[in-house]
Amino acid sequence: MVKYISILGSTGSIGTSALDVVSAHPEHFKIVGLTANYNIDLLEQQIKTFQPRIVSVATKDLADKLRTRISANTKITHGTDGFIAVATHPDSNLVLSSVVGVSGLLPTIEALKAKKDIAIANKETLVAAGHIVTELAKQNGCRLIPVDSEHSAIFQCLKGENNKEIEKLIVTASGGAFRDKTRDEMQTLQAKDALKHPNWLMGAKLTIDSATLMNKGFEVMEARWLFDIPYKKINVMIHKESIIHSLVEFIDGSVMAQLGAPDMRMPIQYAFHYPTRLPSSYEKLNLLEIGSLHFEKPDLEKFPCLQYAYECGKIGGTTPAVLNAANEIANALFLKNEIAFFDIEKTIYKTVEAHHNVKDPSLDAILEADQWARQYANELLIKKR
């Protein structure tokens, strides 16, 4: 069966990897829609290669500019409405949500309402509104298929298993660019230092989140919703080689793990062709060459953002959305070298502390909390600049 796919965030690292997968298996995958924010040069190339029916960009000016450069019969839209139009296009049956940040939330929700299966790589959607997204998926008979390597690993380990027999999930983490640094050393490090991820090729925002371990915190929160597992049953383990992507321990003591080379095209391909597998020409895992694998506990004093994620997830309500929004603001300013590395964790902590949580929030309440947190975090950081 051919999958007809729309990709939200086609010019990012996940989006370009996804298009590599489509190119490798044109008989199985066809592109219906693509979205990008500002990188219309790359989007132009993608349109010419994949001939989508519809694309969307951030602004009207960019859409007008793109129209002058495209002769293909592709509809060009813009803004949130344009992203939603791509996500809900009637010809697609699978939507890859790979945009960065909470901007992926509304298109994902509308795609679920349109009864699309979601290959989800946008952590923030489940962090901010996991209860809404998972309930919508159930109501509309849609599948949420994880794309992150860690969640894909758990998803694969649980295939054919009974979730009631899970003892715990073990989410692995590389440790990020600063894993071998002391707190004193980290204090003066800049964005260019954090962007040197030891194992994975990722976008800038995600690489900074990896350096703070906030990315792993988000993955814990994502796992809670994807697999309907309480936080007390989700552990994190540092695994520097990034070969074991995650593990599941069962009540009888058995442990299942999924291993593979650190290449995002593999979990993307699995999500695209689920529930069956396709051959690939990607690098194969050779354990004899690797020789040994190493594991250790995460240091929560050194990386407090991971602990913040656990605490905010347990509180629930609008607090996870506030955590995410404060992180997005601080992360972006650190990337611009306008604040110090430790200002990220301080901003998150102060913003969450100032928030008045709303339990069982509506989508509007989540979006309102998101906007409040962005403004509050910005005001905190104005004093730092």
UniProtKB/Swiss-Prot annotation:
Residues binding 1-deoxy-D-xylulose 5-phosphate, per UniProt: 123, 149-150, 174, 197, 210, 215-216, 219
Coiled-coil features, chain-numbered ranges: none
Signal peptide boundaries: none
Entry keyword set: Isoprene biosynthesis, Manganese, Metal-binding, NADP, Oxidoreductase
Iron among keywords: no
Any single GO BP term: isopentenyl diphosphate biosynthetic process, methylerythritol 4-phosphate pathway involved in terpenoid biosynthetic process
Gene3D superfamilies the UniProt entry points to: 1.10.1740.10, NAD(P)-binding Rossmann-like Domain
Disulfide bonds: none
InterPro entries: DXP_reductoisomerase (IPR003821), DXP_reductoisomerase_C (IPR013644), DXP_reductoisomerase_N (IPR013512), DXPR_C (IPR026877), DXPR_C_sf (IPR036169), NAD(P)-bd_dom_sf (IPR036291)
Keyword Manganese: yes
Cofactor field: Mg(2+); Mn(2+)
Reactions accelerated catalytically: 2-C-methyl-D-erythritol 4-phosphate + NADP(+) = 1-deoxy-D-xylulose 5-phosphate + NADPH + H(+)
MF terms in GO: 1-deoxy-D-xylulose-5-phosphate reductoisomerase activity; manganese ion binding; NADPH binding
Binding site for NADPH: 11-14, 39, 122, 124, 203
Metabolic or biological pathway, per its Swiss-Prot or TrEMBL entry: Isoprenoid biosynthesis; isopentenyl diphosphate biosynthesis via DXP pathway; isopentenyl diphosphate from 1-deoxy-D-xylulose 5-phosphate: step 1/6
Binding-site residues for Mn(2+), renumbered to this chain: 148, 150, 219
Classification via SUPFAM superfamilies: 1-deoxy-D-xylulose-5-phosphate reductoisomerase, C-terminal domain, Glyceraldehyde-3-phosphate dehydrogenase-like, C-terminal domain, NAD(P)-binding Rossmann-fold domains
EC number: 1.1.1.267
Family according to the record: Belongs to the DXR family.
PANTHER family: 1-DEOXY-D-XYLULOSE 5-PHOSPHATE REDUCTOISOMERASE (PTHR30525), 1-DEOXY-D-XYLULOSE 5-PHOSPHATE REDUCTOISOMERASE, CHLOROPLASTIC (PTHR30525:SF0)
Job description of the protein: Catalyzes the NADPH-dependent rearrangement and reduction of 1-deoxy-D-xylulose-5-phosphate (DXP) to 2-C-methyl-D-erythritol 4-phosphate (MEP).
Protein name: 1-deoxy-D-xylulose 5-phosphate reductoisomerase 1
Species this chain originates from: Bacillus cereus (strain ATCC 14579 / DSM 31 / CCUG 7414 / JCM 2152 / NBRC 15305 / NCIMB 9373 / NCTC 2599 / NRRL B-3711)
Name of the gene encoding the protein in the UniProt record: dxr1
